[in-house]
Design a protein with these regions (language model features):
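Catalytic cores and adjacent flexible loops of soluble metabolic enzymes
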Residues: 1-172
Length: 172
């Protein structure tokens, strides 16, 4: 059974969440038989140092293979939070194509870290995911077009602009 500490770094109702509180919830879900613990920044207020502190608490109770990260990009910290998580050994993350998503009970919260940004980071670190970045960028452009919005992925937007600049000009 998978469980999550959904507001491990900040709560829209109580504000900041301490590492002690995260560990208390992690212990409780472990006691009821949850075998995978997601550490989530659902409203996107986490920073790398605080993410590492929360993860270190979860990793006291679960092996690294049973802990995952879920980071929204409200304040532009999601990719830094993924990197900070990698530094403590995490290797499982939730991400969303084109950075889609949000949080209905947290005004202004954006979607999860964009899959394209995570793939670019991992590739830059020499980590082979077996996932085609170009394919994900194409998928993000398609779904964003259907939704009538621009992708929020910095990587996706940069690669789309690079492709457009490299395309031969149309003759008139």
């Amino acid at each position: 059974m998978r469980g999550a500490v959904s507001v491990a770094l900040g709560c829209p109702y109580q504000g900041e969440v301490s590492a002690d509180e995260v560990e208390r919830v992690v212990r409780l879900i472990k006691e009821i038989g949850v075998d995978h613990c997601g550490v989530c920044d659902t409203i996107g207020v986490g920073t790398p140092k605080r993410v590492q502190a929360a993860l270190e608490r979860a990793l006291k109770h679960y092996p690294v293979a049973e802990v995952s990260g879920h980071f929204h990009d409200t304040y532009g910290q999601a990719i830094g939070n993924v990197y900070a998580s990698l530094e403590v050994g995490l290797f499982t993350f939730d991400a969303s194509v084109a950075g889609l998503g949000g949080c209905p009970y947290a005004k202004g919260a954006t979607g999860n870290v964009a899959t394209e940004d995570v793939l670019f980071l991992l590739d830059g670190l020499g980590i082979d995911t077996g996932v085609s970045l170009d394919g994900v960028v194409d998928t993000a452009a398609f779904i964003s077009g259907v939704l009538g919005r621009k992708p929020v992925s910095r990587t996706g937007n940069a690669l789309i602009a690079k492709r457009a600049a490299a395309a031969p000009a149309a003759c008139s």
